[in-house]
Amino acid sequence: MRQFDFMGKRRLAFTTSAVMLLIALVSLAVQQLSLGLDFTGGTLVEVSYHTAPSLDTVRQTLEAAGFQDISVQTFGTADEILIRLQQAFDPNVGQQVTDLLRAGGDQVTLVRAEFVGAQVGEQLRDQSGLGMLVALGVVMLYVAFRFQYKFAVGAIVALIHDVIIVLGAFSLFQIEFDLTVLAAVLAVIGYSLNDTIIVYDRIRENIRLSRIDDMPAIFNDAINQTLSRTLATSGTTILVLLALLVLGGDMIHNFAIALLIGVGVGTFSSIYVASALLLPLKLQRTDLIPAPKENEDAEELP
């Protein structure tokens, strides 16, 4: 199998990561995220059609009636429509929306009308941020316990790198960020960590077994040995996500986009961030070999 010099390209990879992070951070600071109803609060109306309608027609009908900041998507089947309105709750809004849609001659049934308060949205936003921080903290403790603290630093930097780039992409293109996307971001953390752990495990074993101290060469061998597994896993995952993106409907469209970005970036970071960072952190063979106990030499003496 061909051997790729991954570590030889690490400076180019670091530059690429730095550029992506800079763009993501600038976008998050300037444009911020386009938060969905789950975080901002608003009204949710679900209606059922006798035959599948055109989403653009539904949106245009409501906009013509004076509704603003409308999100229209299918919910489950093509004839079930979910309408999100960024407005204060009106107990009659469900019936108003239904009457407007019926005016076009369609058979429309109101399924439900719910309101998500702004305070609830703020709580969800705070809890989701706290949950992400807790997840990263647990990951750092796990990697430090299973490997060594330098591995933990590399893993955490890689995960933060992945999360920022996914969030930055959603900010840059103003794709709605809701609870399903948050779930995808947490899934990206798990996926990226899994890739990183596999590469780390091979690096650790190669360091222990190798008779040379050329760390870049040892890292290259480890990454090349796990490359086929990494590409196979990422490739099959991307195929499934593409199917979800095309066939899954609007409800999981943004979820699939977040995972597609995350899987691609996570595969990159497991090699060029998590692993390559071990070189400037000066990982050495002695870091992975337990120090001898003081009384071991005395016990071996006759």
What is each stretch, according to the model?
Residues M1-P302:
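A structural signal for conserved, well-ordered secondary-structure elements
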